Amino acid sequence: FRVSAHTRSFEERLIAIGLPYKIIGGLRFYERKEIKDIIAYLRLVNNLGDDLAFERVINVPKRGIGKTTIGKINQIARLNNISMFDASRKFAEENQTKINIEINNFILNILKWQKVKKNFDHIELTKAILEDSKYVDHLENEAKNSKNPENLSRIDNINEFIESLKDFENLEGFLEHVGLIMENINNTDTQTI
């Protein structure tokens, strides 16, 4: 496929009929960084206890929250037997640093998106996340500052992702679908076409 964003429907059809496949010279649609990032945002909004999603997006786009800070948040979570999201709130309350402003902004956005989720559909939620997090701006800046043509297609992938949401009634149905796709991809035999 010349435009990588167009592979999604083809890939989903192959999975639906149980035909293993391999993408040559690229990644499967749901394995692309920008798609994984948006899915992680959606998973976290849907479930504040999703620590893997939290770790993926706490610093995406870059907020100056490094591995040391994430390690401290993780330690608070383990010591208090709470989610990393709740631990980040505790960390921000206990530490008066520049980073805690970024963490607080992140927390406030996640909580705001939970309200959006209650009042709007999953498509509007995704658009709100992309806009409020400045994720598309981040991709545009990456494309502008890079000579890698793949960076230009990332925004197309995001648009295709939003288009794919129309096939589902709600966020939970979509996330369940993606979970099954990823499970299927991980369990694929070595024989592929």
Report the location of each language-model feature.
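A short beta-strand-to-loop transition that corresponds to the Sensor-1 phosphate-sensing loop
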Residues: F1-S4, G25
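Conserved helicase C-terminal RecA-like lobe
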Residues: S4-L19, R32, I39-I193
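Conserved RecA-like helicase motor-core motifs
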Residues: G18-R28
